[in-house]
Amino acid sequence: MPIPGTPSRAELVDHLVKTRIAGDVATPRENNLSHYRKLANGERNWWLGLELGDRWADEQDVLAVMAERVGVNDDPEYRYGQDTIDPELTVDALDRLAGRLRKAAEDRQRVLFATGHPGGLLDVHRATAAALRAAGCEIVVIPDGLQTDEGYVMQFADVAVLEHGATLWHTHSGEPMRAILTALEREGRPLPDLVVADHGWAGYAGRHGVDSVGYADSNDPALFLAESEGTLQVVVPLDDHVLSPRHYDPMTAYLLSEAGLA
């Protein structure tokens, strides 16, 4: 559903709802609550590279943050059925993200891009990296030869990804980002001034003390908890894998325009 040029805020909100990037999203309520419960129970796979300790051991506290920052239904008795992402909250977060990208461009910062959802978000990150490079930023090149238990840490179109069996791999793990930052320090190279990512890539960078911003779905609460605690600077709520990656193009155009990078 292409939108010619850069959409207005109202046009973008409408587009997000029509494509189910926000609004009535594909992730059902029971899946959201299951993930909130697993995080609260200390299942580290759902911590997305972060260290949450026992601060979020109450599932209802997690739900409250997700209602505030994402727009899911705030009723703890609502257990099954349709859940939502508030498109106004999505655009609000895009505006905050645009402000951080604008600062990166003004200061000619070193920026690292990464994604654990290459099927949906790779081109969002690629386009943002290209715009920042054109504005004078250094896009961090990751060290060669990195791997985790899941696969090899590679870089395509300026975006770090996990490769497994000649396939770009979906991962929520923070280990690929750990591998990158550890290797940069080992080589005596400076860490990024900013990481733009999602899932565990964003989570681990924030945990490591690097300015980190990113994207997260309604069933991935850890990054929103980290944003509420100040560990991550901005997290944009959205469905991270809709029917076509082209559906994200108007969102990216809006983001880059608001950041002064279009």
What would you call each of these model-derived segments?
Residues A114-H125, D198-G203, N219-P221:
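Gly/Ser/Thr-rich loops at beta-strand to alpha-helix junctions
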Residues V213-A262:
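C-terminal functional extensions of proteins
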Residues A134-G145, V210-L225:
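Short, acidic/small-residue loops that bind anionic groups at enzyme active sites
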Residues P2-G116, P143-G145:
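Metallocofactor- and cofactor-centric catalytic cores in central/energy metabolism, strongly enriched
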Residues A127-I180:
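Long, charge-dense
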Residues A98-R102, L121-G136:
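Histidine-anchored nucleotide/phosphate-binding helix
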Residues A127-L132, R207-G214, E229-L232:
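Short, solvent-exposed amphipathic alpha-helical segments in soluble enzyme
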Residues I180-V210, G214-A216:
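Glycine-rich phosphate-binding loop
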